[in-house]
């Protein structure tokens, strides 16, 4: 498999975690979202992915998959063990609910394209920072109430909710949103920091991570 990715992309980070948790080998193909206006906007990449976003996963059969939820769902169905979702329908729905909260209601509101549009509309950096802090804080406060009070988000092993939450926490801290108000979330962040799959997928450990 080949993963078109960017080291700091939250959506790419999710897919890297899922691949690592399942122990799947893949070739990382970095797509620089900054250099020369963004490689994702260049004809060569648009020919692969007309949406011009990362991640995109080329599977062994040659098909190119886009959008992290669809990619992760494919990985879960194609490589069911170790499972990212519970076998219990109710718990599985709760896991998907937290993943959707992060992926649909938090992340899109601080996506680079949204922040750049705010700047184009005349908002200064302090206003952009307040925008990020409002939406990230509101979303994570809800997540704090929805996840379990011990272990990972839902139990003693990482699953789909953690795959979504941990990259969001990286983004939150990068934008200056402290996690101190949310002890359950802080606990998950600490577990992830010590877990080999999450360390492997971390933005600091990617082929395109800039040198310090």
Curated annotation (Swiss-Prot):
Residues 1-83 form the GST N-terminal domain. Residues 88-211 form the GST C-terminal domain. Its EC number is 5.2.1.2. GO terms for biological process: glutathione metabolic process; L-phenylalanine catabolic process; tyrosine catabolic process. The keyword Isomerase applies. Pathway: Amino-acid degradation; L-phenylalanine degradation; acetoacetate and fumarate from L-phenylalanine: step 5/6. It is an enzyme of class 5 (isomerase). InterPro entries: Glutathione-S-Trfase_C-like, Glutathione-S-Trfase_C_sf, Glutathione_S-Trfase, Glutathione_S-Trfase_N, GST_Zeta, GST_Zeta_C, GST_Zeta_N, Thioredoxin-like_sf. Keywords: Isomerase, Phenylalanine catabolism, Tyrosine catabolism. It catalyses: 4-maleylacetoacetate = 4-fumarylacetoacetate. One of its GO terms (cellular component) is cytoplasm. The keyword Isomerase applies. GO terms for molecular function: glutathione transferase activity; maleylacetoacetate isomerase activity. SUPFAM superfamilies: GST C-terminal domain-like, Thioredoxin-like. Belongs to the GST superfamily. Zeta family. This is Maleylacetoacetate isomerase. The gene is maiA.
